[in-house]
Regions:
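Phosphate-ester processing/binding pockets and catalytic centers
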Residues: 2-154
C-alpha cells in the first residue's frame, strides 16, 4: 500500500509519467529495462509518500484477502479517504466483499478498481514491491522511502 497526500497527487503522477516511452500507457516493473527501473525508484525516493508492504505466507487469493482486511483496518482508523486498487477482474467481486465487511458503514471514503494505465499512482506499489522481492541492490534502493514492513498472520 502506498499513501499519497491529496495535494501531492498531481505532482507525483507527472513525475511518474515522464518515464513513459512514446506510446507506452503504463509502467510495470517486471517489463521495464534496468535503467528505467533505477530512474523510477530514484524519483520515488524523492516523493513525499508513505508505503506499507504486507507480508503473508498464504497463496495469492487468500493472501490478497488477508492484506485487504489489514489495509481496511488502517483506512478505517486513519485519514485516508480514497483507495484505488489494481483491477484484476477475477478478484474485484471478492475485494468489494472483503472491503465492505472490513470497512463497515463508518468509513466515509471511496474505493475503486482501476487498470494501471488509468492511474499512474498504481505504479508506486508495483515498483516498491518488485524491488523488495528482488532483494539485494534493488531492495537497498528503497532505503530513502518511508517504508514499513507489516507481517500478517492469518
Amino acid at each position: 500500500a502506498v499513501y499519497v497526500r491529496p495535494q501531492d497527487v498531481h505532482k507525483i503522477r507527472t513525475m511518474l509519467r515522464k518515464h513513459l516511452r512514446s506510446g507506452q500507457r503504463s509502467i510495470h516493473f517486471t517489463k521495464e529495462r534496468p535503467e528505467v527501473r533505477k530512474a523510477v525508484i530514484a524519483d520515488i525516493a524523492k516523493m513525499s509518500i508513505k508505503a506499507e508492504l504486507y507480508k503473508v505466507a498464504e497463496k495469492h487469493r487468500e493472501a490478497r484477502s488477508i492484506c485487504l482486511q489489514a489495509l481496511a483496518g488502517t483506512l478505517r482508523d486513519g485519514k485516508c479517504q480514497q483507495l484505488v486498487l489494481y483491477q484484476n477482474d477475477s478478484v474485484c467481486q471478492s475485494d468489494r466483499r472483503v472491503l465492505r465487511s472490513a470497512l463497515g458503514p463508518g468509513w466515509s471514503g471511496t474505493y475503486d478498481h482501476l487498470h494501471d494505465h488509468q492511474e499512474a499512482l498504481l505504479w508506486l506499489p508495483d515498483a516498491i514491491s518488485w524491488c523488495w522481492n528482488k532483494g539485494g541492490a534493488w531492495r537497498a534502493r528503497l532505503s530513502d522511502i518511508d517504508l514499513k514492513i507489516v507481517p500478517l498472520a492469518r
